[in-house]
């Protein structure tokens, strides 16, 4: 009987539980459970928690704990990312651990970037030696620059689809909101201009490629496919621009596409999709990325492969 490996990712938009087995170094028998908690909105500027999200998070963890206890994995890792990095409430962290019955490891942005990279290279067929990995979370965005198949640089930005949505798109999202978000993001991601200059010699010799790992990237693929595109899990900046116009419903030209989206994309994702798309567009423009492909794994898969290979991170 094969060992079971589990990871619980306490993200800013949702809590993800994934339990798997391995066969021939590959993940099999994949079980997934998700709880939308919008945890990224829980933290005040002071690092304190809003009571509404405290209660919601504990209730979600209680449900997850019951699932784990029904069929516990042999190895389990619980990780917290940006939102938990920003919390200065140790009592709440202890409450979370007591509810789960497991310790929580709050990982650094560099650790997160390394695990995302591990998740991508262990699950995704990669042809280029030089590329970017883009991971748009709920409250942070990680960008990993890969040169000659090795990590060159990991950058983390304190903005994600959930927090940007709270800043610009709480009303349905107009073209004015969209433009203002792009201007704001151009400043947030200004550090990427230096990264692009570092890679300018590579840019001359090849089209620059990126792998996207987040819910935003998956939703873009599903959306374009629902419109009749044959994406084959890749898309360009022009495709992103088109999808942004659909989400805004520019000049009411996209009623048909909007209906398709409602039937294709989960409402929790759809509600923050324009903000995630704005982040993706801004990064793509600054880094002059030609093609974005969907990766088959990311942070959770990186944790699972580390557990499988080392029985620890």
Task: Place the predicted regions along the sequence by residue.
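Helical "lid/coupling" subdomains associated with nucleotide-phosphate turnover
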Residues: 42-66, 83-94, 98-130, 145-147, ...
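Short, glycine/charge-rich beta-strand/loop segments that flank catalytic centers
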Residues: 74-82, 110-115, 134-139
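Hydrophobic residues in beta-strands and at strand termini
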Residues: 37-39, 136, 159
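Gly/Thr-rich phosphate-binding beta-strand-loop-beta motif of the actin/hexokinase/Hsp70
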Residues: 1-29, 120, 126-157, 215-219
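N-terminal glycine/serine-rich phosphate-binding loop of ATP-dependent small-molecule kinases
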Residues: 1-6, 10-16, 20-83, 90-102
């Amino acid at each position: 009987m094969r060992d079971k490996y589990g990871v619980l990712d306490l993200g800013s938009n949702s809590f993800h539980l994934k339990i798997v087995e391995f066969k021939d170094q590959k993940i099999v028998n994949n079980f997934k459970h998700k709880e939308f908690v919008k945890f990224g909105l829980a933290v005040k500027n002071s690092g304190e928690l809003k009571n509404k999200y405290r209660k919601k998070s504990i209730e979600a963890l209680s449900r997850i704990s019951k699932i784990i206890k029904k069929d516990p994995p042999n190895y389990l890792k619980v990780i917290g990312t940006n939102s938990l990095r920003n919390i200065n409430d140790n009592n709440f962290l202890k409450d979370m651990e007591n509810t789960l019955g497991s310790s929580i490891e709050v990982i650094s942005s560099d650790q997160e970037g390394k695990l995302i990279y591990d998740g991508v290279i262990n699950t995704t067929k990669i042809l280029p030696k030089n590329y970017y990995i883009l991971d748009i979370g709920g409250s942070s965005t990680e960008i990993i620059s890969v040169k000659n198949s090795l990590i060159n640089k990991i950058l983390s930005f304190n903005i994600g689809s959930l927090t940007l949505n709270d800043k610009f798109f709480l009303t349905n999202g107009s073209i004015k909101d969209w433009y203002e978000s792009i201007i704001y993001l151009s400043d947030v991601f200004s550090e990427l201009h230096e990264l692009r200059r570092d890679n300018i010699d590579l840019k001359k010799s090849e089209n620059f490629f990126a792998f996207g790992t987040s819910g935003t990237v998956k939703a873009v693929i599903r959306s374009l496919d629902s419109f009749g595109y044959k994406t084959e899990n890749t898309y360009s900046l022009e495709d992103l621009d088109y999808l942004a116009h659909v989400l805004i419903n520019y000049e009411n030209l996209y009623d048909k596409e909007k209906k398709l989206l409602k039937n294709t994309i989960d409402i929790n994702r759809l509600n923050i999709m324009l903000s995630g798309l704005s982040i993706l567009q801004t990064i793509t423009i600054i880094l002059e990325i030609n093609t974005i492909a969907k990766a088959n794994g990311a942070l959770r898969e990186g944790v699972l492969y580390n557990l499988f290979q080392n029985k620890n991170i």
